[in-house]
Design a protein with these regions (language model features):
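C-terminal lid/capping helical subdomain adjacent to the catalytic/cofactor pocket in oxidative enzymes
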Residues: 2, 23, 328-382
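N-terminal Rossmann-like FAD-binding beta1-loop-alpha1 element of flavoenzymes
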Residues: 3-28
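Short hydrophobic core segments
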Residues: 5-7, 189-201, 205, 351
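Active-site substrate-recognition segment that forms the wall
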Residues: 18-22, 45-47, 76-80, 178, ...
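Glycine-rich FAD pyrophosphate-binding loop
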Residues: 21-41
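Dinucleotide-binding Rossmann-like beta1-alpha1 core, especially the glycine-rich loop
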Residues: 44-119, 128, 256, 293-295
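Short beta-strand to alpha-helix junction loop
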Residues: 59, 86-93, 132-150, 281-286, ...
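Helical element adjacent to the flavin cofactor pocket in flavoenzyme catalytic cores
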Residues: 131-185, 189-192
Length: 382
């Protein structure tokens, strides 16, 4: 019998499995699809501090950034400490970006308009300036999930970690109000602890245990270009509107210019956000808008072909904070979901914090802001 079952083999579930195995626990990971078959496989691989408001999520991001750098020495998942450049079209927006960077208290360099081309020679002229964040990084998310799982087996014992894909969890088993395991299409698996790392489907898993988590899908599209012969973009580059959209509560369509290159030479173009359920219908108007915004940032992209697009669903929480920790309503149930667009970046810290709880140790950060029952408490106090 495993010590803990992790539901979800995306990058968050993989990180939970890695750190729990490192802590000496026997772990079974279950997923109805393949490893990284959900939101992880539709992500750009961002590890950002630049888009975080000062507070609990930024604290998570800073620790997770350091953990990603450590993990990059354990496994190869195309970790790039490339830095992020946030650009502004007007002086007013530039000043707002500068104020945010100061409040964040993170490493940054304010860049005047005349200095932008030292960072990105192919940027469009006329921008008012921006802020460069050297800590912003990127990984290949599917590689990260797969290789974290592989590293856990190789470093901490093949028998300590079992990964079972194509196995759908049908229910969470309890006795006396406490978790005793899960029910799957292949039978029941017993364990004293279950981690809900089901991402956008985290609310469904929580409901199986009789608790509510208001996690909603927030759709986003990404365009992928043909590989470029010569590097065109050095960093992750995005407009100030991206920061605004990340913090938005709107269910309607919001887009912002986001452009970055990959080690293979392709360019990833985003970003869009909208709450339309799990509708995967390709939206040509959205893709056209993304392409236009990218060309506005980098005019040379007008001569580059887009070869494909894809969409994914970010796990959105109403207060824009992830759900991390033990659920007091059902002892033995732990949550690691609701990270919205920051799941890849926050995966290691999520896994580390939960491994501390499972091992009976003090977490590295205060988990109170991320507690699973905070939404029920908010409703009761209205």
């Amino acid at each position: 019998m495993p010590d803990v079952i992790v539901i979800g083999a995306g990058v968050v579930g993989a990180a939970c499995a890695y750190y729990a195995t490192r802590a000496g626990l026997d772990v079974t990971v279950l997923d109805r699809g393949p490893v990284a078959g959900g939101t992880t496989g539709a992500g750009e691989g961002n590890i950002l501090v630049s888009d975080k408001e000062p507070g609990p999520e930024l604290d998570l991001a800073l620790l997770s950034n350091r953990l990603w750098r450590d993990l990059s020495t354990v496994a190869d998942f195309e970790f790039e400490a490339k830095g992020g450049l946030v650009v502004a079209e007007t002086r007013e927006v530039r000043d707002t970006l500068q104020d945010l960077a100061i409040k964040q208290g993170v490493e940054h360099q304010v860049v005047p308009g005349a200095g932008l081309h030292a960072y990105e020679p192919h940027l469009a002229p006329g921008l008012a300036g921006g802020v460069f964040y050297p800590q912003d990084s990127q990984v290949q998310p599917m590689l990260a999930a797969a290789r974290l799982l592989a590293a856990a087996r190789e470093r901490y014992g093949h028998s300590a970690l079992r990964v079972r894909t194509g196995v759908e969890v049908k229910g969470v088993s309890t006795a006396g109000g406490r978790v005793t395991g899960v029910r799957t299409g292949e039978g029941e698996i017993l364990a004293p602890a279950v981690i809900n790392a089901a991402g956008t489907w985290g609310g469904e898993v929580a409901a199986m245990a009789g608790v509510d988590l208001p996690i909603l899908p927030r759709r986003g599209f990404i365009l992928v270009t043909e590989p470029l012969r010569e590097p065109l973009i050095r960093h992750k580059v995005y407009t100030a509107a991206y920061v605004t959209n990340v913090a938005s509560d709107s269910a309607g369509l919001e887009t912002s210019g986001v452009v970055e290159a990959t080690p293979s030479g392709t360019v990833l173009i985003g970003a869009s956000r909208e709450r339309v359920g799990f509708d995967r219908t390709t939206s040509l108007p959205v893709l056209s808008r993304l392409a236009a915004q990218a060309v506005a940032l980098f005019p040379a992209l007008s001569a580059v072909r887009a070869i494909r697009s894809y969409c994914g669903f970010r796990p959105y929480c109403p207060d824009h904070l992830p759900v991390i920790g033990a659920d007091p309503r059902v002892p033995g149930l732990y949550h690691a979901c609701g990270h919205e667009g920051a799941g890849i970046g926050l995966a290691p810290v999520t896994g580390l914090l939960l491994s501390r709880l499972l091992a009976g140790e003090q977490p590295d950060l205060d988990l109170h802001p991320f507690r699973p029952d905070r939404f029920a408490f908010a409703r009761e106090t209205r």
